[in-house]
């Protein structure tokens, strides 16, 4: 696996579990002898929902809800087979979406 790169994108609604899982990935990769770049914080995506408070009238009275998606990027340079094995066995929290590109 010489001169290869594994790019891992993490997404979550909570930044605390995102940072925790990013630290686990970096720890695992460093223990197996791979070079690490990251975790790099990517821009937070903010989705805003505006709804009427009342079901029939009072259009001026509205309520707003927002949903934030936090993202991190980790590059693993020159991974060894041991690195790939340990990343496959890694147990991460359920609220984190992981996207891996080789």
Swiss-Prot record:
GO terms for cellular component: ribonucleoprotein complex; ribosome. PROSITE patterns: RIBOSOMAL_S10 (PS00361). Keywords: Ribonucleoprotein, Ribosomal protein. Pfam families: Ribosomal_S10. GO terms for biological process: translation. GO terms for molecular function: structural constituent of ribosome; tRNA binding. Gene3D superfamilies: Ribosomal protein S10 domain. Signal peptide: none annotated. Involved in the binding of tRNA to the ribosomes. Belongs to the universal ribosomal protein uS10 family. Part of the 30S ribosomal subunit. This is Small ribosomal subunit protein uS10. It comes from Lactobacillus delbrueckii subsp. bulgaricus (strain ATCC 11842 / DSM 20081 / BCRC 10696 / JCM 1002 / NBRC 13953 / NCIMB 11778 / NCTC 12712 / WDCM 00102 / Lb 14).
């Amino acid at each position: 696996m010489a001169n290869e790169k594994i790019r891992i994108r993490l997404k979550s609604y909570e930044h605390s579990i995102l940072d925790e899982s990013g630290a686990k990935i970096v720890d695992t990769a460093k223990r197996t002898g791979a070079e690490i770049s990251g975790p790099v914080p990517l821009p937070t995506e903010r989705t805003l929902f505006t709804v009427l408070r009342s079901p029939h009238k009072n259009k001026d009275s509205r309520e707003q809800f927002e949903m934030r998606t936090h993202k991190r990027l980790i590059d693993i340079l020159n991974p060894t087979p041991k690195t790939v094995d340990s990343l496959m066995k890694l147990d991460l929290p359920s609220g984190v979406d992981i996207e891996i590109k080789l």
